[in-house]
Amino acid sequence: MILQNKIPSIYHSIFPELLDIEFPEEQIATCDTCTLCRSPQSPYINTKCCTYQPTLVNFLLGGVFVDDDINLAIGKERIQSQIKSRAGVTPYGIIPSNAYIQREKQANSHDFWSRPHQLVESIRCPYSHKGLCTVWKYRENLCVTFFCSSIGGAAGKTFWKKVNTYLKMAETSLAQYAMLQLGWPPAKIKTDAVTAADFKFEEEDGIINDAKYAALWGDWIGREEEFYRSCFNIIKNIDASTFKQITGQTREILEAAITDTQKYFQLSNLPDFLLLHPDVVTDKSNENHALLVLGEITAEISSALLPLVYSFNGKRQTVEVFQLGYNVLFNMSELVEELREKGMLIKP
């Protein structure tokens, strides 16, 4: 698979150098058959991993409005509702509101697998509808690059983190460029990615300070949708040369980092089958924990995970064993990484 298949089409003419970079197909974490939904007890049964509000920058929002694709109709309506509420609505894009951030903090105060269903669903992405994304063609960086389990293990996660950083850099730089081209005062343009903390128009209780909101938007107040459309019309005509000029050395460094990490990703791809080393001895003397021993090398794991480890028998596909883990609300990524590094999981 190549990055062109993952990156939204709006970027294809802007940074074509990245499009042909190959990577192993992510077979464990797939959106259509979400691993987080395998167990009926999963708190994510109705949300998948979409317990996150993406920051849609100005030109991505404009893309949703300009595009006639029927699959974006619900997304348009939801963005229009956000604009009407004014919560999180800025010239840079629509960011998570203070109210959303507070709900997110409350959810994150619980362990990942033990979060209450109601709390998890309170932080469902506002663009999610019946398990599908209503703004998919114009999704943001994390929605392109997040995998709860990568087929490349730690190397895969490192690769996607670099791609994520690159896309976030592109979003931020292009959003600022669009504002500049539309006559926004340069001294008022923030040069970093923005968060709710950068603006003071929303109180902690969620009440919007209309005067501060009007001051933020200036002459564009009441024409937010038009502004976002204008941003998109600017960015859609940008070529690769202009993008390079805008992003400079930061882009060069990140492109090199993506190329470097891609090599390790390819080399670290999990085999289709894994086998627990025949010489591994299991010490079960502790009721709650088991000690896997291979010569002088040891690994301590929860006794409840032994059946999963034994499932690596050289006959069961690696992806299937990961699925068994999610069936009991356990992500096997770190454990598999550790056992492979210690030589306890090998190719049959």
Name each model-derived stretch.
Residues C50, C143, L275-L276, V281-T282, ...:
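Bulky hydrophobic/aromatic "packing anchor" residues in well-ordered structure
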